[in-house]
Amino acid sequence: MSIGILGTKLGMTQIFDEAGNAIPVTIIQAGPCPITQIKTTATDGYNAIQVGYRETKEKNLTKAQLGHLQKTNNSALRVLQEFSIESSDSIEVEKPITVELFNDNDIVNIQGYSIGRGFSGYQKRHNFARGPMSHGSKNHRLPGSIGAGSTPGRVYPGTRMAGRKGDSKITIRGLKIVKVDSERSLLIVKGSVPGKPGGLLTITQVKKV
């Protein structure tokens, strides 16, 4: 994973380009994310930085978590996440990760949790075709066969069935940053991102090959 920043989805709107075309964009409150730990190959076996996000009350954290954050003089932070790096020589604990990590027109990957839809049936969750809705049919929204009786005599693992829909980790790749607002720590990204307003997002740089 490339170095990135944590943020909060604020919502969607639209902006207009020079030709007057409407562009759908998502507004993201990104960072600042203080560095809470620097991991090196000498001490941990790999190079990475750990960053924090979303300040909270100390009573919401354990003593172990508070002690970990106090090592770098950070306040109580609800979210901690690691980003792998090639070298930690240029990383300073005193300098938090901000939106200045990105520039206009950069391409990024954004990860978040999709909106949870609760317990859903076959048609809504997996787009199954429904049965006839009239003429004496008793198979309106049933799943149909889920396996033979004697052989194999069981339901195969992974069979698509009714269950909880959504609330899964989703990564949208190749999104374009339209504008970086350093003063208000905002990223304006073209297109949609996972989750509902207020959801946690991870924005990472795309590795250049």
Curated annotation (Swiss-Prot):
GO MF, any single term: rRNA binding
GO cellular component entries: cyanelle; cytosolic large ribosomal subunit
Keyword tags: Cyanelle, Plastid, Ribonucleoprotein, Ribosomal protein, RNA-binding, rRNA-binding
Pfam families associated with the record: Ribosomal_L3
Keyword rRNA-binding assigned: yes
Localization of this protein: Plastid, Cyanelle
Disulphides: none
GO biological process: translation
Spans annotated as Disordered: 132-154
InterPro entries assigned: Ribosomal_uL3, Ribosomal_uL3_bac/org-type, Ribosomal_uL3_CS, Transl_B-barrel_sf
Keyword hit for Glycosyltransferase: no
Transmembrane residue ranges: none
Record family assignment: Belongs to the universal ribosomal protein uL3 family.
Its job: One of the primary rRNA binding proteins, it binds directly near the 3'-end of the 23S rRNA, where it nucleates assembly of the 50S subunit.
UniProt subunit comment: Part of the 50S ribosomal subunit.
PANTHER family per the UniProt record, alphabetical: 50S RIBOSOMAL PROTEIN L3 (PTHR11229), LARGE RIBOSOMAL SUBUNIT PROTEIN UL3C (PTHR11229:SF16)
Protein name per UniProt: Large ribosomal subunit protein uL3c
Gene: rpl3
